[in-house]
Amino acid sequence: CILPTSTVYCEGQKYVSKLDEIRQVEDFLHRQGVERLAMVVASSIGADLAMAFLTQTKLPVEHAFFDGGQFAQIGKGTRRIMTPFLYFAIRSLYWSKGGTLKKILWCDDDSIKPYFISAGKNLTYTDLRRQISDSLEDKPFPPLPQKLQEHTYFEFGSKEEHFKYRQAVMEAYPCGHYPVFEGYDHMQYQICDPKGFAGMLTHIAERDCMPELPFIRK
């Protein structure tokens, strides 16, 4: 189950709350007849929704993988101030046909531009404001059972800004796994080598360990 960042970037959706986002995901899974999840995968700010999902879903989850998780704990006032700046940054991706992507992300690869352009097109200020109001909150991380921690991977690239959250996450979930992709930037492996990234996730789900990759910090 690959958790979305949020439905605020999807056409025709309205953001109500994080709980409603989780309900939509669970309803979808139930309609598909899903009774267990081999793995939950989340990237960047999608980590916020995924962590809430993991702590509240009744579906059995065998593994979880976070790629460059946005685990910031930001005060309510700061989140309110940052909302308009974030809105214009994301909307600019649509207005510029992806031309401003390099200002937001480390790369502007043509293979990922359409997704960011679509996100910028669909985003409304009201939906983003509602999402930010109950995301990245300045409160302790939700507890994860030790057994699930032992099968959860919090991966960060050594060059990415989100690497700064690694220590706090390690303290919150001491039984988790914390691979570092040496020399890699934010989500770089899944962007540059999606087949390799998918193969890595399959290896974890099937063998319960990281594969031998040359760029994993020893």
Identify what each model region corresponds to.
Residues 184-197:
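Catalytic histidine-centered segment of alpha/beta-hydrolase-like enzymes
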Residues 76-78, 93-146:
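Conserved alpha/beta-hydrolase catalytic His-Asp/Glu region
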Residues 41-50:
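Gly/Ala-rich beta-loop-alpha elbow adjacent to hydrolase catalytic centers
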Residues 133-171:
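Conserved serine/cysteine hydrolase catalytic core
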Residues 2-39:
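Active-site loop/oxyanion-hole signature of alpha/beta-hydrolase fold enzymes
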Residues 173-187:
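Catalytic histidine neighborhood in serine/cysteine hydrolases
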Residues 55-91:
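Flexible "cap/lid" loop of the alpha/beta hydrolase fold
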Residues 5-10, 71, 185-188:
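Alpha/beta-hydrolase active-site loop signature
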